[in-house]
From Swiss-Prot:
Active site: H360
MF terms in GO: glucosamine-1-phosphate N-acetyltransferase activity; magnesium ion binding; UDP-N-acetylglucosamine diphosphorylase activity
Family, similarity comment: In the N-terminal section; belongs to the N-acetylglucosamine-1-phosphate uridyltransferase family. In the C-terminal section; belongs to the transferase hexapeptide repeat family.
Pathway field: Nucleotide-sugar biosynthesis; UDP-N-acetyl-alpha-D-glucosamine biosynthesis; N-acetyl-alpha-D-glucosamine 1-phosphate from alpha-D-glucosamine 6-phosphate (route II): step 2/2; Nucleotide-sugar biosynthesis; UDP-N-acetyl-alpha-D-glucosamine biosynthesis; UDP-N-acetyl-alpha-D-glucosamine from N-acetyl-alpha-D-glucosamine 1-phosphate: step 1/1; Bacterial outer membrane biogenesis; LPS lipid A biosynthesis
Catalytic reactions on record: alpha-D-glucosamine 1-phosphate + acetyl-CoA = N-acetyl-alpha-D-glucosamine 1-phosphate + CoA + H(+); N-acetyl-alpha-D-glucosamine 1-phosphate + UTP + H(+) = UDP-N-acetyl-alpha-D-glucosamine + diphosphate
Protein name according to UniProt: Bifunctional protein GlmU
Coiled coil ranges: none
Main enzyme class: transferase
Length: 455
């Protein structure tokens, strides 16, 4: 079965009280529309057609991709009118209609819905709610067959008592859709062309309206204001927390843990409170992450320990290595197996060999550090001359004394040592001691200044 997907994303979202288009408001680090597009892609459709209107330029700019066809709805005249704008681009046998502000819809739910569709049957996703206020009501006949959907504003008291609501998510035979959309009327309380009226037309044309339900109501919850947006955020985070715990991860407090990207986590991993995982993060078995850490676009190999208050971005931490507390690893940083980065250490585009140690209060930028090398406290690489970046290379078994400035480009070869307080501007040969500091003088008879009294 070939498939086209239409995503309705033209709404203004006035209740958000924001200049940002509603569908671009983020849930878990990705826009609501971005979540929907991600789910749509997993269905392998012929095309994904995004109907845009308010803030169209911003939507295009943020989400532009080769597999997306943006369709403009100049006037917002209802959901039926919105789908009609995409009709000329539809070529598949089945059309699935989704909504850009319903970000938590599961691929499994959509797959079940699509299985209902055939030339004589369409699929409708409904949800049963204790309070369906605001939802269109699913009207069924005496044989429990769907015969119509009545919007909440147009419903009478009997219809408002119905607890089965319309989610708006619909899968239909494409050959029928153009005819039904062409017959829509705006004779209703809103003066709009409702997509829901397609259901009654399908029934009148002899088609069966088969229904499917999501695993939970939050899966089809939209966000019209900031409160609803926060509810979606919290539901998503708890869902991700449960998924990780089911896979063998210990979370000290699932309510104080955030995922904002694609995360792969191994078994026997311990994650403390207030940890944020952003972007693409891979965490292997037996990793420990302390409290208040941010891990972004990074890989943590087996047995890594990240201590409290560390920020790691674009880095690879080798097996058995550790970082923190208060460590910052910037993009391009690599820790070899069993390497150690201590408190208040910043790395940027630095590669530490196996067993290398950078204990504290250090900055290494654009540096290559060999195995088992030890770098003393207060050391910095002077890698930028105001115009260009330069590299510092330290061999294996090097010992850098405390409070060193390594002025790049410079090489310190295997087994070399630098004295504390040195400013190293020249290469240090293998197993030699580099000393670059002024000789100390002790001045006899020196008097400490005294404070001048002011009368």
């Amino acid at each position: 079965m070939s498939l086209d997907i239409v995503i309705l994303a033209a709404g203004q979202g006035t209740r958000m009280r924001s200049a940002l288009p509603k569908v671009l408001h983020p849930v878990a680090g990705n826009s609501m529309l971005g979540h929907v597009i991600h789910s749509a892609r997993q269905l392998s459709p012929n095309g994904i057609h995004v109907v845009i209107g308010h803030g169209a330029d911003a939507v295009r700019e943020q989400l532009a991709a080769d597999d997306l066809n943006f369709v403009m709805q100049d006037k917002q005249l209802g959901t039926g009118h919105a789908v009609a704008q995409a009709l000329p681009a539809l070529t598949a046998e089945t059309v699935l209609i989704l909504y850009g502000d319903v970000p938590l819809i599961e691929v499994e739910t959509l797959t079940r819905l699509l299985k209902l569709v055939n030339p004589q049957q369409l699929g409708l996703l409904t949800v049963t709610l204790d309070d369906p206020t605001g939802y269109g009501r699913i009207v069924r006949d005496q044989q429990n067959r769907v015969c119509a959907i009545v919007e909440h504003k147009d419903a009478n008291d009997v219809q408002k008592a119905i607890t089965e609501g319309n989610t708006g998510i619909l899968a239909v035979p494409a050959k029928r859709l153009a005819d039904w959309l062409g017959r829509l009327s705006n004779n209703n309380a809103q003066g709009e062309y409702y997509l829901t009226d397609v259901i009654a037309m399908a029934v009148n044309d002899g088609l069966i309206v088969a229904t499917e339900q999501p695993y939970g109501a939050m899966e089809v919850q939209g966000a019209n204001d900031r409160k609803q947006l926060s509810e979606l955020e919290r539901h998503y985070q708890l869902r991700e927390a449960r998924r990780l715990m089911a896979g063998g991860v210990t979370l000290r407090d699932p309510a104080r843990f955030d995922v904002r990207g694609e995360v792969s986590v191994g078994r026997d991993v311990l994650i403390d409170i207030n940890v944020i995982l952003e972007g693409k993060v891979v965490i292997e078995d037996n990793v420990v992450i302390g409290p208040n850490c941010v891990i972004k676009d990074s890989t943590l190999r087996k047995g890594v320990i990240v201590k409290a208050n560390s920020h790691i971005e674009g880095a690879i931490l080798g097996e058995g290595s550790d970082a923190g507390p208060f460590a910052r690893l910037r993009p391009g940083s690599v820790l070899g197996a069993k390497a150690h980065v201590g408190n208040f250490v910043e790395l940027k585009n630095a590669n530490l060999g196996e067993g290398a140690k950078v204990g504290h209060l250090t900055y290494l930028g654009d540096a290559e550090v060999g195995a088992r090398t030890n770098i003393g406290a207060g050391t910095i690489t002077c890698n930028y001359d105001g115009a260009n970046k330069h590299k510092t290379t330290l061999g294996t078994d090097v010992f850098i004394g405390s409070n060193n400035s390594l002025v790049a480009p410079v090489d310190i070869f295997d087994g070399a040592t630098t004295a504390a307080g040195s400013t190293i501007t020249q290469n240090v040969p293998t197993e030699q001691l580099g000393v670059a500091r002024a000789r100390q003088r002790n001045i006899e008879g020196w008097k400490r200044p005294v404070k001048i009294r002011k009368d």
